[in-house]
Curated annotation (Swiss-Prot):
Residues 18-31 have a biased composition (Polar residues). The gene is hisC. Its EC number is 2.6.1.9. It is an enzyme of class 2 (transferase). GO terms for molecular function: histidinol-phosphate transaminase activity; pyridoxal phosphate binding. InterPro entries: Aminotrans_II_pyridoxalP_BS (IPR001917), Aminotransferase_I/II_large (IPR004839), HisP_aminotrans (IPR005861), PyrdxlP-dep_Trfase (IPR015424), PyrdxlP-dep_Trfase_major (IPR015421), PyrdxlP-dep_Trfase_small (IPR015422). The keyword Endoplasmic reticulum does not apply. The modification N6-(pyridoxal phosphate)lysine is found at K207. Homodimer. This is Histidinol-phosphate aminotransferase. Belongs to the class-II pyridoxal-phosphate-dependent aminotransferase family. Histidinol-phosphate aminotransferase subfamily. NCBIfam families: hisC (TIGR01141). It comes from Microcystis aeruginosa (strain NIES-843 / IAM M-2473). It comes from the Bacteria. It holds the Pfam family Aminotran_1_2.
Length: 348
């Protein structure tokens, strides 16, 4: 038998969204941005391709400085990572010893549990109510690190701001607020950084900046926190192509703001249309919705859509087994989805 660590052997592998290997699918299952980045960001790509034999900037200096100017944070309060998942792992490895406790909600991004178990941490899950929302702040003095996504998948709603404030104020360890979907909402928690010295905010460029294929993320925190996380960060953890295109994308922030508005408009139309078809659909502040179909099961809807080359996300989690998660696509993609659903439901 392989000499595998017990905590690794006993942990189920994380299950990512399906990536079709054939053309023709409408892909609404992994919360990617349906719109490409502007062509202008590729202007310096050739220059970087000619330098691929050389190591990239080990600290992503220009990228961090560009992010600092955009978000109004000092560059030394920012760490860049290989996607925001890298930031989650760095925080865990920096601040939590094996056998210490990590807390998160009972229904949230499933990678939190996976990486905590692989690390050998104790798991503490906090329950959400029947609307998948917090009913109060998380009070957990034994937790060295609390992962909280806001907006929180798979529902897509922000956590109650007052509850988050109280959680941060009362935490004896660190609180990492995962803002992967925040650009599709009207709120964020960057102001927490000036009021709580135990807060880390993670961001990704996969969703809102259309760079899921490059893997670029950030951690924002106090200088003291970033200094420690930087010791744990892998050397050269962000390649030069990713650094170049991500820096350029941030400089085209105005373009992406228009994209986010498009996504919000399409999201609203999809919610309204599905409710008219009898679906139970939660309001969302992300680039996806959670919906429960009438008449047939969520798994049957998933299968029938897949037969029509439309991918949505189905989870076997008992609390949401009657729901599918649908990423917001282009208007044309959503039209195709709605037509297929009407055909499946026999409402054409």
């Amino acid at each position: 038998m392989l000499p595998t660590r017990d905590c690794v052997r006993q942990t189920p592998a994380y299950t990512p969204g399906e990536q079709p290997q054939t053309a023709g699918f409408t892909k609404l299952n992994t919360n990617e941005n349906p719109y490409p980045p502007p062509a202008e960001i590729f202007a310096h790509l050739q220059e970087q391709l000619e330098k691929v034999r050389l190591y990239p900037d080990p600290i992503s200096k220009e990228l961090r400085q560009t992010a600092a100017e955009l978000y109004g944070i000092a560059a030394d309060q920012i760490i860049a990572g290989n996607g925001s998942d890298d930031i989650l792992n760095i925080a865990l490895r920096t601040f939590v010893n094996p056998c210490e406790s990590v807390a998160f909600l009972d229904l949230t991004y499933s990678l939190y549990e996976t990486i905590a178990r692989v690390h050998g941490a104790n798991i503490i899950e906090f329950p959400t109510n029947d609307k998948f929302a917090l009913e109060g702040p998380i009070i957990c003095p034994e937790a060295k690190l609390i992962f909280l996504a806001s907006p929180n998948p798979p529902l897509g709603k922000h956590l109650d701001r007052d509850y988050l404030e109280a959680t941060c104020a009362n935490a004896s360890g660190l609180v990492l607020i995962d803002e992967a979907y925040v650009d599709f909402s009207d709120d964020n928690h960057l102001d927490f950084l000036s009021r709580y010295d135990n807060v880390i905010i993670s961001r990704t460029m996969s969703k809102s900046y259309s760079l899921a294929g490059l893997r670029v993320g950030f951690g924002f925190a106090s200088r003291a926190i970033i200094e420690q996380m930087d010791k744990v960060r892998d050397s050269y953890n962000l390649d030069r192509i990713a650094q170049t295109l991500a820096t350029a994308a941030l400089k085209h922030h105005n373009y992406f703001e228009q994209v986010w508005q498009k996504v919000r408009q399409t999201r609203g139309r999809l919610i309204t249309s599905l409710r008219e078809l009898g679906f139970i659909v939660f309001d969302s502040e992300a680039n996806f919705i959670l919906a429960s179909p009438p008449q047939i099961s969520a798994s049957e809807l998933y299968n029938q859509l897949k037969e029509r080359q439309i991918l949505v996300r189905y989870f076997k989690h008992p609390r949401i087994q009657n729901y599918v998660r649908i990423s917001i696509g282009t208007d044309g993609e959503i039209d195709r989805l709605l037509s297929a659903i009407q055909e499946i439901m026999g409402t054409n």
